[in-house]
């Protein structure tokens, strides 16, 4: 069924298709019996999938990645779609329109996306009001970024303001300094710039705080950020954001689409490399959320055994459809049982722990 729906949706410009899907999801969420039925059909049911990470109970490890539901307008839909949690955003302290359209492109031959959305959102205050009015049944993280018009020198106050507004209402917060679509944002990943931002957000809220990093960092930069996250007692790291690399793409004419971040399978190999390096560096001292190129249960299992406590997807959901999260969760549960693991936590990092020293 979904392959036909996808072919029809792919006839529409990507951002218009996105809005259409959102309208359908909001309609579904508004009808409680339908929402409950979908949750029974698509939601995770095996208790072996549940885990407690940074003090939050997750019914299953695969969540919706930030960027899909930027303003939390479909909060009730994500549990019904089979996700174990959802990350809303990126939101900024002030509303902003993002970059001019067109700004979202399908790379169909690569099952990938290119986006240069630019943090279009209604602002942290609007999201806070929405979160206060409605609490879904799954954990809801919030991804916060810097307002484009805010100068880099005032980034600390900008992130602090967002944390103040949404922190008390989120299951966890993610500090996003890694989108390639806000000028100068990735420069904030340098430790001397990142330290005051993370310290300010940590001081502003008791909610678990994570940092989201780019896949294009050098190994030494990855190590520095991992060490900083441990030093500041962060809850974890989200790895990774989209990549600016165009290596290996097969979709014709991609260079003519202009700048932006690539998500989906072209990112997978680097995302796994980053995850393994981070886990080898920090072990169980931080929770690692792996995102980037996860399409199948095999992909998900590779990330879990490489050190990911939680997973996220966006592009895989677009190409995979409504059963995507369910199929991955069923595959993870099957591998846990077949491998003799008593819990998801036991499997996290198991492949790395077996590596010879």
Curated annotation (Swiss-Prot):
CDD domains: DHOD_2_like (cd04738)
Annotated positions binding substrate: 70, 115-119, 176, 181, 241-242
Residues that, per the record, bind FMN: 66-70, 90, 143, 176, 212, 240, 264, 293, 314-315
GO molecular function: dihydroorotate dehydrogenase (quinone) activity
Keywords: Cell membrane, Flavoprotein, FMN, Membrane, Oxidoreductase, Pyrimidine biosynthesis
Superkingdom per UniProt: Bacteria
Cofactor(s) needed: FMN
Membrane topology classification: Peripheral membrane protein
Cofactor annotation remark: Binds 1 FMN per subunit.
Biological processes per GO annotation: 'de novo' pyrimidine nucleobase biosynthetic process; 'de novo' UMP biosynthetic process
Keyword Flavoprotein included in the entry's annotation: yes
EC code: 1.3.5.2
Active site: 179
PROSITE patterns with a match to the protein in the record: DHODEHASE_1, DHODEHASE_2
UniProt GO cellular component terms: cytoplasm; plasma membrane
Localization per record: Cell membrane
Subunit structure: Monomer.
Family, similarity comment: Belongs to the dihydroorotate dehydrogenase family. Type 2 subfamily.
Name of protein: Dihydroorotate dehydrogenase (quinone)
């Amino acid at each position: 069924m979904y392959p036909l729906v996808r072919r029809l949706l792919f006839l529409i410009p990507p951002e218009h298709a996105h809005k259409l899907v959102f309208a359908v999801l909001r309609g579904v969420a508004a009808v409680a019996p339908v929402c409950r039925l979908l949750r029974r059909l698509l939601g995770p049911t095996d208790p072996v999938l549940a885990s407690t990470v940074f003090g939050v109970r997750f019914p299953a490890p695969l969540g919706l990645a930030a960027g899909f539901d930027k303003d939390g307008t479909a909060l009730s839909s994500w549990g019904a779609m089979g996700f174990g949690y959802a990350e809303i955003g990126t939101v900024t302290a002030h509303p902003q329109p993002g970059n001019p359209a067109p700004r979202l492109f399908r790379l169909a031959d690569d099952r990938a996306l290119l986006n240069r959305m630019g943090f279009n959102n209604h602002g942290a205050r609007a999201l806070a009001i929405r979160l206060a009015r409605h609490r879904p049944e799954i954990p809801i993280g919030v991804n916060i970024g810097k307002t484009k018009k805010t100068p880099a020198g005032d980034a600390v106050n900008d992130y602090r303001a967002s944390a103040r507004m949404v922190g008390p209402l989120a299951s966890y917060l993610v500090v996003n300094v890694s989108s390639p679509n806000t000028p100068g944002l990735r420069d904030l990943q340098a430790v001397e710039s990142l330290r005051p931002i993370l310290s300010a957000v940590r001081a502003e809220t008791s909610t678990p705080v994570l940092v989201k990093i780019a896949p294009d960092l050098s190994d030494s930069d990855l190590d520095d950020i991992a060490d900083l996250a441990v030093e500041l007692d962060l809850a974890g790291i989200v790895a990774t954001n989209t990549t600016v690399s165009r290596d290996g793409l097969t979709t014709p004419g991609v260079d003519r689409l202009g700048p932006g971040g690539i998500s989906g399978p072209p990112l997978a190999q680097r995302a796994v490399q980053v995850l393994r390096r981070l886990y080898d560096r920090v072990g169980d001292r931080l929770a690692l959320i792996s995102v980037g190129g996860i399409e199948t249960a095999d992909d998900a299992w590779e990330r879990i055994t490489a050190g990911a406590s939680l997973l996220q997807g966006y592009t895989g959901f677009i190409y995979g459809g409504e059963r995507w999260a369910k199929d991955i969760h069923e595959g993870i549960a099957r591998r846990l049982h077949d491998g003799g693991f008593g819990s998801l936590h036991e499997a996290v990092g198991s492949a790395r722990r077996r590596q010879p020293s």
